[in-house]
A protein has these predicted regions:
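Short, intrinsically disordered, charge-balanced linker/junction segments flanking boundaries
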Residues: 177-181
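Phosphate-backbone binding interfaces of nucleic-acid-interacting proteins
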Residues: 1-174
């Protein structure tokens, strides 16, 4: 509203995590290794109300009582992969366990996103992690190229509202004119 009232058009405000769909915390109840599936285990999980079956190749990481992130059918991973109900032989997977990378919260790709014992079940993982990253989409006019960065928007808000503006700080690897490899 402040930017709009000062003549800058805010086209949209959105939370990219909410666009992903239903990604919730679930507890693994049972892990079963069927003889007719080589690299996959069948996990029975609950969100505290309902029960789901999930097939996963992370067989060395899953165990009973572990709380993990489940992307339900119809949701998307942070890498834009749509999660669907899948059937392998006679087994049906009702979602997908996510790594921190697939959930969009870190670069770790080779492990499941797990939570501490006692974490509420059936809640959005982003709510549990207290993550909310609203994104402003601002229409920039040709004469206001200084607003093309987050720092430029912060400087503008500093001028309009007299809010404190912290100076930009760079790590030692960016000081002194070093060139990136």
């Amino acid at each position: 509203e402040i930017l709009t009232n000062s003549g800058h058009e805010v086209e949209e405000i959105f939370d990219p995590f909410k666009r992903l769909g239903e990604i919730i915390t679930v507890k693994i109840l049972k892990v079963h290794k069927p003889e007719d599936l080589k690299e996959v285990v069948v996990c029975e999980v609950t969100d505290g109300k309902d029960f789901f079956t999930v097939l996963t190749t992370a067989k060395d990481q899953v165990k009973p009582n572990l709380i993990v992130a489940l992307a339900k059918p119809g949701s998307f991973t942070f890498t834009h992969q749509k999660v669907e109900t899948k059937e392998i032989r006679k087994y049906v997977s009702q979602g997908m366990f996510l790594s921190p990378f697939e959930a969009g919260i870190s670069e770790e790709k080779n492990k499941l996103l797990t939570f501490e014992e006692g974490t509420p079940l059936g809640k959005s993982i982003y709510e549990v992690l207290n993550l909310s990253e609203p994104v402003l989409e601002v229409a920039i006019t040709p004469n206001r190229g200084d607003l093309l960065s987050i720092y430029g928007i912060a400087r503008e808000l500093n001028l309009i509202c007299n809010w404190e503006l912290k100076p930009l700080e760079f790590g030692d690897d960016l000081k002194g004119g070093k060139v990136f490899p």
